[in-house]
Every structure is written in structure tokens, then in C-alpha cells.
Amino acid sequence: MKSTQQLGQEAREFEFNPNIPLHLYLKTCVTLLNNASECFQRGDKSLSYFYYFRYVDLCTNKLPNHPTIRSTSTGLDNDSKLYVQEYKQLLRLEVPHILKIMEELKTELDAMYERHKVSLANNIASPISYKHNNRMDALLHDYYTERGCTGHSMQHKTSLHKNENFNERINLMKDSFMGRAPNGSQEVRNVSNTFYPDLPTLS
């Protein structure tokens, strides 16, 4: 999800060509508003905000530099005068209304963006820890099953994960594989050669 600041920056990134006739840019304004309205109706408020922002930027920052807008009325033909009047009407009536819509959208999108960041932060560490715990529990279960521990005995041994941290459980597995029985017992079990085979010596 993008922030409203990112959406605004992207909305400004378009090439304005003053040689394009004013009436074509006025049609572009209508298209931008239609796109914004359609996106809003289908629930894509981020894209709706993008189109509204581009519309306002075109009307207030780009079009004032258009040669037809900057020309005096005496130097324009009748059609151009009508286009200038239409543009001024946009500035007086439509733009203020669109700015209010954008303000409401911005408030909603900013709140959604903050919730999105919090959700991402909460989901980073917890799945990793959960997977490690489940993996160690499975290793302990397989280890004691192979050695004939069942029922209460296995439950007692595997319950270590409830009150020992990850490193302590690693040490428990290491002691068992090296022939030392868990929980301080003097019993020594035979370790199968299938565990941790010798690695070849590097020359």
C-alpha cells in the first residue's frame, strides 16, 4: 500500500506540453474526474485519490502556464475565449469541491496506511518463532519415539519446551546425541550412526 505522499508525487509526474490546445486539456480534466469517480465506486480509493490529485495539479499548477490562458482576451478568437471561461469556471466551482473530497480521502487513506504498517510490523517476528518451536517439538517427539519412550515418559521429557528456551533445547538434543541421557539420568543410550555422519576432510 502507498502513502498519500507517494500517490501525490506520482500524480505530479506527467509531461505538460503547452503546445497542445487548451480544449484538449479541458477534455483531459473531464477524463481524470471520471476515472477518479469510477475508482472510488469500485472501492479503489488509492487510485481515486491519485486521479483527483492529478486533476487538481493540472488545473492549478500546469494550465496557468498555457499560452491560451496567459493571453489577453483581445488576442484570442471566440472559441479560445470560451475555453478560457470554461477553465476559469473549473477553478471557481469544481476545484474547491474536489479539494474537499481529496481531504476526506486523505484522512481515510492515512489511517489505513498506518494500520497497514502496524500489521506488517506485528507479522514479521511471530511466524519465525512459531515455526522454530514446532520444529523443535517434532524433533524431540521423533527422538524419544525411536528410543521407546511413550505415554507419560515422553510427555514429561517433551514438556521441557514449555519452560526452557530454544538454546536449552538445542543443548538437550546435543547431550542425547553424544550419549548422555537427558534430565541428569546416568543412563547412556547407543546413538545410531545415521545421525550426523562424518564430513570429508578438506585438503
From Swiss-Prot:
The cellular component terms of Gene Ontology attached to this UniProt record, alphabetical and capped at eight, are: endosome; membrane
Q: What is this protein called?
A: Regulator of free ubiquitin chains 1
InterPro entries from the UniProt entry: USP8_dimer
Record-linked Pfam families: USP8_dimer
**Location(s) in or outside the cell:** Endosome
Q: Could you give a GO molecular-function term held by this entry?
A: cysteine-type endopeptidase inhibitor activity
Gene symbol? Answer: RFU1
Keywords, sorted A to Z: Endosome, Protease inhibitor, Thiol protease inhibitor
Main location class:
other
The source's superkingdom equals Eukaryota
Record family assignment: Belongs to the RFU1 family.
Enumerate the PANTHER family for this protein.
AMSH-LIKE PROTEASE (PTHR12947), FI19924P1 (PTHR12947:SF13)
Q: Which GO terms describe its biological process?
A: protein K63-linked deubiquitination; ubiquitin recycling
Q: What does this protein do?
A: Inhibitor of the DOA4 deubiquitinase involved in the regulation of protein degradation by the proteasome and maintenance of a normal level of free ubiquitin.
